[in-house]
Structures are given as C-alpha cells and as structure tokens.
C-alpha cells in the first residue's frame, strides 16, 4: 500500500510541475527525488509534457540534478553516506531520461540551459509559484535530503572559516615580506616600497575578482555535468576501491588522473587495486548510461550532415578535457576485454546468478565506439565528382590527402590509439576479440541446449576492431603477423554468411567487407591465407583445405546465394578477391568451380546488360584470374583445369555481339548457380562441360539456359513482392532502419539515382585507392533491391553494340584466351589418346608452362580503402543503430524523434 501511494504522489508532483512554475528552493523536488525512476512510459510522457508545457521547470529540475552530482564529488566528497550515493543514482537515472528528450526537440533549449546558463522563460500561460508544499510521506530518501541540507549548511560554514584563515595567512605573509624589504639597502628602499604597493593593489583586485566569480559561476552546466560524470566513474567508494583515498586526485596529480584508478588491468595498465563487486558494477552502469545519453546528440541529426556535425558535448570530452582520457580509455577497453561469460565452462552458470559485468561491457564498447568515431570533417567538398576526367580526380585526391595531413585530429582518444605501439596491448585486445566473437557461436552449437548464455557483443566489437585497424597501422601489422592470424576470420566470416540471409542483418556483412578490404591490402595477410585450415565451422559448407578456400566460398555465397541481392558490396568483394589473388595457392577444386560459376553468373548478357556499370564486376573477376595465372600458375593447376573445362563461357564473352533486335532481359530473370558441396560433384560438373576451340554463337534462347541444367537456381522476385514492401524512405539519402527486435541488426540503406554511373553513392576515387590508370569506385552503402529495380525501370538502359565493343576492350580477357588456345589442343590430344582421365590431365598440367605466353606480365596491383563523407556517415548511422537496438531496458532512446535513421514501429 505504501509503495502504491508514494507512486501516486510521485506522479501528482509531476502534474504539479506541468501546471505551475516551481522555484529552485521548493520542497516539491524532494518528493520527486524520493523515489527511483521506474521504466514506465508514464514517466517519459510526463517529462515530454514538462518540456513542452513548462520548460522553465525542466530547466530548474536539470540544475537540481546536476548540483546533486557536483555536491557529492565536491564539498562532501569525504563525508558521503550510502544515502548520498543512492540519491546520486536517482539523479543519474533522471538525467539519462531527460537528455534524449532535450536533444530531440532541436531548439535552443539545450544551449540555453547547458552551455549559456540562461534562464528559460515561461510560456504564454501565467506562472504561479507554490506557496505551500504538498503533503508527502516520510520515507528514507526524504530524511536523507533533510540531513543533506544540514550538511550543506555546515559545509558552507566550514568553507567560510577556511577562507578567513587563508586571508589571515596571506596578510601575515605580506607583513613578513615588508619586514624583509626594510632590511635591504637604503638605495633600494624606494624601489621596493613602490613594488610592494603595486603588488598589494593587484592582490586586492584579484581578491575582488575572485569574490565576484564565486558569486556568479560562469562554468557551463554541461561542463559541470560531464566533469561530475567522469569524476564519478573513478570515485573511491562509489565505483573504485576506497584504498585509493577519498581526497580528490587532482590535488596529488593535477595533470592527469593516475591509471591506478582504472577499473581493471590488462590494456595500458598491468594491474589495479580495485576488486570488482556487485555494487560497483551497478554504480558504474548508472554513470555509463547517463554518459552515453550526453553523447547521443548525433542521433537527432540527419544523416546527410552527421559527418560534419560538431557536438559541443563530444568536443569537450574528446578535445577540451585531458585529465580523464587515459584512465577512461583503459577502463572502457578492459571492462569488455576481461569479460568471460564461459569462465570455467560450467553449464547453465548464467541461471545461477546475474552478471552485471555483461551490461557494463556492452555499454563500455558502445561509448568507446562513439568516442573513437567522432572526428567531424572540416571541409564540405568531400563528395566524389564523377563527371570530371581522371587527371582531375587524381588532383582532387592529392588535395584531400594534403588537407588531411595538415589538419590534425583534435580527438585525444583517436590520437592515443594512433600512437599505441606496445605489442602486449595488441595481443591482449586481439585475444579478447577472438574470445568474445566465438561466444555466440559456441552458445548456439552446444550439446546441452541453452547451457551457455548467448552474449551478443560481436556487432559492437566488430566495429571496434574496424576502428583499431583503420587508426593504428602498427596494430594492423601485428594482427597480420600474429602466429594464428587467419583464425579470427572464422567467426567473422560465419557472421557475414549468416547476415546475408536477412535484410535486417546486412550491416554485419557491410562492416565485415570493410575489414576484409583493409586486410587485403597487406601482403603478409594474403600469404597467411595459404595456411591449412584449422578450425570449426558451423555453416553448411564443406570443410575448407586452406583459409583462401573459406574466404572465396563465403564471398561466392554473398554475391550469388543471397535472398536479397547485395549489389552494393559486389565491387568491394571483388576488389578484395583481386587484392588477394596474386598470393593464393593450392585452391581446391570446389573453390575453382565456384570461381567459374561466379564468372558465368556475372558474364551472362542478362546481368551484363542490366546496367552500364556491371561490366566492371566482370573486369575485377578477370583481373583476379589473371593474377592467379601469372603469379601462382604452378600451384593452381586445378584452376587451369577448371578454366579449360569452362572455356566456352570465355569464348562467348569474347565474341559477344548485340543485334538491334536483341532486347535486354530484366534483372529478375537472372539465374544463380547453386553451391557445390563436394570435389567429386565438382569434377562431375566440369566433365559435363564440352571443350571447344570454336566460339559459340549467342542467341536469346541459349542465353536463357545455363551450361549446367540443374546447377542454377532462379532468383526471380515477383512484382507483387516488390510493391508490398514499404518505400517511405527519402530518396537520395542514406538511412538506417533498425528492426523492432533486440537481436536484429539494423539495415543500412541507400538509394540509386536515375543514372547509377554518375550520381549513385560510390566508394570511388575517395574510397578505394589503386595504382591502376582507371579509377575504381565502390558503391556504398547497400541499396535495397526494390529501389534498384525501380531505378532500372526508370533509367531504361539499352546497350548497343558500340558500347559493348568498347567495354570489351577494357576487360582483361586476352591472357586467359591465350592460355586456352595454348593448352586446349594439348589436352584434347591427351584425351583422344588415353581417354579423359582427370588425374593424367592434372599431372600433365603440373608439367606444363606458360613461359612466353604473357608478353607483358602486369605488376601486382593493390587497392586500398580511404575514408570519405559517405562512408563516414554510414559508419555513424550503423554504430548508433546498434546502440539504439541494444538499450531497451532501460529505454534510453525509445519513443524519441530519431533523425539519423528510420525507425520502423
């Protein structure tokens, strides 16, 4: 009965706030702070009404809450009681709900209250002050508040006494100085007297200024709030052990807080005196929740301008303050790096006790990602100009690189990550990454059902790994040269393979392709993929022989065997394959057949003529095959055998022509080859293909049939299915649509324009840097399939024979045709003499050579990733989508006006 009545009075107090202007000294605030804030939609509605109807009361309430935090970490720092900490937790919970409501409005309320210290005037309705406080029930928290007010008065008296004593000490020192000056020589007496009088006058003016500043504090309320939150994260007795001392660490170390105040040891600090307990984790959680809401201003900014948006909150914590940077960075990293949900491997251990370390680990990763992502672009001319010539694009890239080199990053956290060089820290982070990434896979494939809790930190941690790899090249090198470096790809590629099945999980596919693109630019990483495959996979594919087989198999499934076509990653995935191909050895027959099926899929007229830029996909794949033939011919005889068996497809492309009568088929009718499971089936499929030196003529009837009748699957999508999907998104913008479930990954969408080769968002000269003469462009983020189809219907691209002959000159097909014409007669003669024995053919190919066939073997070309405004805005949207989806209890951002991405209710 008591709790129900107190809850009613609590709600009644909010109703009073919505009707009348309440002064700062009113007892009504005691009633509001006397009860914990429950996760109830009523409180959220009341806070929104308070913001809209009585903004002056909300501003007073915010000042009241911030003053409580300042009081706990300031005046009564050494005399806090458990009741004071309880009141602090209540204040933190209120602030974490109020800040998103303040940010979503987009008005000047936040600037006036938090940064300008201006008062909020009431709205048009008349204001009335409360004369008598409402009757409240006697609770523990109200008694705490009354005791706290008494303590405040006592503390003020103590401070006044200290100030009087300090003034007396200063007067004594001045008198001593005067006595010493009188003992000097008579010649200098006049000079010394003048200097003493001037110093006395300046001291008096300084004292007057200090008294004026003490009477009117000009520090922004946001700075007080952020400084209090950072102090509470390392507050002895609240979040760390009391053995560190209750006095402020700024007295002993004014430059930076000692790293011993970190929560855990491991990264950056070997050991810390703090021992974890449940209450520490609860207090840390409340502070972290309030901190992430302070940094959530980007959620309420449109994605078009988020890459250049400057947040005062993020500017202060990443640039202005330096005192807590190292300790905060170490604490956030070590919190999730030391998290081990499996532990000793006791089954069903998560049912015996609740682990608060898990929630803090998730928030720590998310706050770390927010801090490391904030680096607003200074100049606005970051969009790729695709209408310019190639030399103009190179000049534009050089200017951008010079500007990036001259403009230093202001973010202290990014600067610290870039300067890390300790190998021990790299190994510690990498081992934690491998362990946490494997937890969901282990939990989903245990012999005892639900014996291991499925901790899903892999999405946040994958993004953190991307940030570390992109910022610190030494860390990238250490990962590449690690003794078991390719093993961390096993969970990553499995998540990518699972993510392709649903549109809500395409985000993990995108971030995985970025990581692979970054790694593929390193020669040592490409060579390490030739190691024998040692690991356990849980997806429905054959056990790979080497890591290269595993990578190509997953890439094949991403491009071909996907319900919703991920056309935006086509060029990125094929670029990865092109970077890795010069170093791949001993590819299995299954992998070689998949490469041939992929070439068949991309080179069919139905796919090739769909848009005027699809030929580039064929060019990347042909470049990869050329690299394998030129640089790894002796170790890839299976690939040569597969090329000879599928030479008909290369001949078709070489002699392809377009007659004026030939219509272009819609993309919905493109057939996809199905995955091949065993090497025996691969040999069987290849044996069914005919070897012929004569080019086959093309017709529409033959192009509708595949070389292998039962090996392709139809991926046609009905028009009714396309029309049934909602298309309420704004075109020509990039948006993220989080699903309504907690486990789903947000879908990052972009939309093609009517001319994909000119206006569609691409990762072109600004995104992928290459040494080739032709700029390579990557379209990012992924367009939804229904919008791509609409674009094709609007653009009405009709290929001509002149266009076809022009693009065929750009395709590197000559070397493969030379190999076919050189080896095909020899293989035919061998088959007619002794029969078609695969083993004899393979032995013969091992003895063969292609010396003299390639006149000008091209150099190894590597394309690297470079950031631009489009990809940067996509990363920010993807990061905040994950944060939004995983913070539902308590609901920090639910039912607020999110502008960064679209929320489907």
Swiss-Prot record:
Biased composition, class Polar residues, residue ranges: 690-700, 719-760
Keyword RNA-binding: no
Low complexity bias: start-end ranges: 192-210, 395-404
Keyword field contains Transmembrane helix: no
Matching Pfam families: Dymeclin
Alphabetized InterPro entries for the sequence: Hid-1/Ecm30 (IPR026705)
Homology family: Belongs to the hid-1 family.
Protein's name in the database: Protein HID1
